């Protein structure tokens, strides 16, 4: 048997923490007097880095912008991070773990933080829908594969 078959996959959460938080209401208090029919924009981004052997930090950045016409009602950004021990996987499996599995763990924490910040800004409750990071990761892989195909066709 090869050594690879003897290595079991291991995953452990070491820590989950808020790395950065920002809340701005640039048009307050005037925005409170307007009819509340906002356009809400959600942006997501993930980043990961290796801290030590089998230890990784994953950061999920969630930015929510609510606008009333041309005016920004509020802008909220949360960077929710986690430190994870991950061993026994490599390549695409590791990329999936860092790019989808860990963000799935972090998102509820980021969502709660954003909901709290929006509430403290005295805006109506904001309920962010769950995010399918697995589907986003698959789309990312398909885009990367498409770009690789285009590069080979241009050559």
Curated annotation (Swiss-Prot):
It is found in: Cytoplasm. One of the proteins required for the normal export of preproteins out of the cell cytoplasm. It is a molecular chaperone that binds to a subset of precursor proteins, maintaining them in a translocation-competent state. It also specifically binds to its receptor SecA. Keywords: Chaperone, Cytoplasm, Protein transport, Translocation, Transport. Homotetramer, a dimer of dimers. One homotetramer interacts with 1 SecA dimer. GO terms for molecular function: unfolded protein binding. Pfam families: SecB. It comes from the Bacteria. The keyword Chaperone applies. One of its GO terms (biological process) is protein tetramerization. Belongs to the SecB family. One of its GO terms (cellular component) is cytoplasm. This is Protein-export protein SecB. InterPro entries: SecB, SecB-like_sf. Its main location: cytoplasm.
């Amino acid at each position: 048997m090869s050594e690879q078959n003897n290595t079991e996959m291991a995953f452990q959460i070491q820590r989950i923490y808020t790395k950065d938080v920002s809340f701005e209401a640039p048009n307050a208090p005037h925005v409170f007097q307007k009819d509340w029919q906002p356009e809400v924009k959600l942006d997501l981004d993930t980043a990961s880095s290796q801290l030590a052997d089998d230890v990784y930090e994953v950061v999920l950045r969630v930015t929510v912008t609510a606008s009333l016409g041309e005016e920004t009602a509020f802008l909220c950004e949360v960077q929710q991070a986690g430190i994870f021990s991950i061993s026994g996987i490599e390549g695409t499996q590791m990329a999936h773990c860092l790019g989808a599995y860990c963000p799935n763990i972090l998102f509820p924490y980021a969502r709660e933080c954003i909901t709290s910040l929006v509430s403290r800004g005295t805006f109506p409750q904001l309920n962010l829908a769950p995010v399918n990071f697995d589907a986003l990761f698959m789309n990312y892989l398909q885009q990367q594969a498409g770009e690789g195909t285009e590069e080979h066709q241009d050559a």
